């Protein structure tokens, strides 16, 4: 009986920890360039258009009920010709799961992933230097940490890849997250949406999102408040000890 009670308690505590981890992830996170964000500013599913940001970077968004969105813009230099860098834009969304060991597993909706590869000096660039295609790639991260950056006071997400190497840090940009609808955007069955109905669904989703008072996280005021509160507490405690 004691063993059964222990196991029940163990699983309950484990579920609570996973729930707290999911709450920590909620929001839209962006890399230091602060130019790449998930949502309609990166991918237009109605026009099948990936929109190139001003600077390279990455962005991830997470909801508390297990949905995610990914926006990647990477530029790779060409060692043989520095004027011919290769650019890649990738959009995916789907569901994510936090495993009991703290790893993060993301499963995309296969019909919705898109990739735009731009190679201005490639072999087949006489007609078009860009290749637009479907893209699907499951992702597994070994672990992640959410913390407050000691330098700028912003919330920071540090993700570690499957081999344990850290990715570039991400910073909280929007909460609630800025995302497209979490269901399939490009269904392929007989009940496929028209562009008009898809446009209306996206518009309705974004309108509902704005009603949640999504806000951009750029101020560190609340962190400064707690910092100075802690300093004041330490000073008060020191004064009491000194007077005694």
UniProtKB/Swiss-Prot annotation:
Cellular compartment(s): Endoplasmic reticulum membrane
Database matches in InterPro entries: Rot1
Q: Please give, as recorded in its UniProt entry, the membrane topology of this protein.
A: Single-pass type I membrane protein
Residue ranges, Lumenal compartment?
Answer: 20-222
Q: Where are the transmembrane segments?
A: 223-243
Using the UniProt annotation, give the residues that carry a glycan (glycosylation sites): 81, 101
Q: Which residues belong to the signal peptide in this entry?
A: 1-19
Q: Which residues form a coiled coil?
A: none
Q: Name one GO biological process term.
A: 'de novo' protein folding
What highest taxon heads this organism's lineage?
Answer: Eukaryota
Which is a Gene Ontology cellular component entry for this protein?
Answer: endoplasmic reticulum membrane
What are the recorded GO MF terms, alphabetically?
unfolded protein binding
Q: Which Pfam families match?
A: Rot1
Question: Which residue ranges does the entry give as Cytoplasmic-facing topology?
Answer: 244
What is this protein for, i.e. what is its function? Required for normal levels of the cell wall 1,6-beta-glucan. Involved in a protein folding machinery chaperoning proteins acting in various physiological processes including cell wall synthesis and lysis of autophagic bodies.
The protein here is known as Protein ROT1
Which species does the entry assign this protein to?
Debaryomyces hansenii (strain ATCC 36239 / CBS 767 / BCRC 21394 / JCM 1990 / NBRC 0083 / IGC 2968)
């Amino acid at each position: 009986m004691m063993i059964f009670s222990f196991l029940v308690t163990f699983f309950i505590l484990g579920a609570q920890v996973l729930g707290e981890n999911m709450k920590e992830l909620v929001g839209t996170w962006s890399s230091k360039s602060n130019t790449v964000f998930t949502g309609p500013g990166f991918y237009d599913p109605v026009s099948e258009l990936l929109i190139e940001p001003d600077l390279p970077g990455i962005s991830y968004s997470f909801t508390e009920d297990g949905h995610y969105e990914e926006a990647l813009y990477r530029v790779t230099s060409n060692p043989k010709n520095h004027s011919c860098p290769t650019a890649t834009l990738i959009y995916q969304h789907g569901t994510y799961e936090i495993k009991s060991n703290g790893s993060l597993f993301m499963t995309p909706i296969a019909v919705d992933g898109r990739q735009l590869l731009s190679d201005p000096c490639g072999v087949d660039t006489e007609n078009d230097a860009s290749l637009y295609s479907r893209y699907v790639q499951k992702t597994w991260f070994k672990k992640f940490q959410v913390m407050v950056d000691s330098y700028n006071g912003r919330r920071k997400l540090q993700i570690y890849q499957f081999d344990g190497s850290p990715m570039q840090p991400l910073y909280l940009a929007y909460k609630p997250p800025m995302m497209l609808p979490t269901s399939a955007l490009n269904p392929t069955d007989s009940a496929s949406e028209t562009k008009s109905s898809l446009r209306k669904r996206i518009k309705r989703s974004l309108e509902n999102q704005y009603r949640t008072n999504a806000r951009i996280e750029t101020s560190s005021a609340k962190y400064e408040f707690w910092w100075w509160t802690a300093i004041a507490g330490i000073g008060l405690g020191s004064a009491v000890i000194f007077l005694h």
